[in-house]
Amino acid sequence: MSVHELKRPLAVEWPAELLGDLPKALEQLHHWAQITPLHTALRHKRQGQWYAWRWIDALRDVERLADGLRQQGFDEQSRLALSGAFEPNLLLLALAAQSVGGQVLTLADDVDPEVLHQQLWRIRPTHAYVQDRRQVRHWQSANRLDFTQLLGPTEPAQHLQRWWQPAGETALWSEEGTHWQGGLAVLLEQWLNSGHGLAFPESQASARRDRSEVAPTGLLLSPARLQHLADEIESRLARPGTWRRRLCDWAIAHPQSGLRRLLKNRVRKLLGFQRLAYIWQPLKANAETTWLAEFKRDIA
């Protein structure tokens, strides 16, 4: 592949997506690493245990990854394709690639092999990072990166022996992946703009349990995932038309009802929302369910 080919504007179409320039991202990372170096920046559950990255750890990892990328031939003319669940490795690698000056693209992690091959032929990444082992064989044409090799020898992420929440600690939460169109930009911007910690579950299957352990103060979720949460709430309520459901509907319709507060507190605790104070949503949000509307009304 020639340099001239790489300089051509990419005709990127979903399920592939180009991560736009985030000019302040590295500056913000340096900022938080300087003023709150020991505060937790990232959390991720792995094999049943929570791990944490302080802001100073995140900055150092980005710098190490940038050096590792350069050693793998990544430069201003390169393209890095990312696919998989959002978690610390993926976010830090995206920031490292941008710091080198190369392009970062995401490819939805839920496409079938035929679509995947078409997209890889179209975007022609010079390097790739794929998490799902089931997908690896479909990325044979790409120059797949080994995260551990890129990072080099370093201290392992701080292991949280016991999960605890200091009074007033904020924690953003996401349980998404590259299937969320525009999601990576949302996460990076919200995380780095706020300086709040950002936590991720071990998997989609364990998301509710892991979320309950974190009790996040903010949600960074796609409209589709918010709808999934709404459906989960709906599935735990009594069937429509029953007296129990009519009682729930009546309680929601009467703001001063003690029963309403009891029901909402129960739902909040069930979903890990007892500390929830912020729900990210796009400027043009779709219609939302009654329960999510209630949560947002409380927050406001």
What positions do the PLM features span?
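Flexible, non-catalytic linker and terminal segments flanking ANL/adenylate-forming cores
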Residues: 1-22
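A short N-terminal helical cap/helix-turn-helix that marks the beginning
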Residues: 19-42, 60
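Conserved pre-ATP/AMP-binding loop-to-beta segment of ANL
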Residues: 37-40, 144-174, 178
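Conserved AMP-binding/adenylate-forming core of the ANL superfamily
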Residues: 42-73, 85-87
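A short helix-loop-beta submotif of the ANL/AMP-binding
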Residues: 85-105, 109-113, 126, 172, ...
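Conserved ATP-dependent adenylate/AMP-binding module captured primarily in the ANL superfamily
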Residues: 94, 109-139, 156-173, 188, ...
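Conserved AMP-binding/adenylation subdomain of ANL enzymes
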Residues: 159-171, 178-265, 294-298
